[in-house]
Amino acid sequence: SGLIGQALLARLEARGDRVRRMVRRPVIDQSEIRWDPDKGHLDPAALVGADAVVHLAGTGIAERRWTRSQKDRILESRTRGTRLLAQSLSEVFPVGGPRVLVSGSAIGFYGDRGDEPLTESSEPGTGFLAG
């Protein structure tokens, strides 16, 4: 539902791929899979037949001050869902589950470098999101 997810969804559908979205709210049709990473809920059977899972989730990093509790929320919002997906995928892998999991979150790997141009070969930053 985020910026990257919506762009990826549009691109995949334009290419002719069938995409099912994972949502936390009640599903509206067969194009959606209900899950709740906070409660550890995901029916692994819903993943059977998929080629891949793309996980682009996490609490926004610019929404609040980075208090200790907000940092914990940011970290948990990324790790909890990924753990649930990895567990569910391991259950369905032998019976036709996805063989690929792509997971991405945050944009802080390089840290705040001001106006310095950053590339894939740039050194990692320091600090909370860079570690």
Question: What annotation goes with each model-predicted range?
Answer:
Residues D17-R24:
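Conserved glycine-rich Rossmann-like NAD(P)H-binding loop of the short-chain dehydrogenase/reductase
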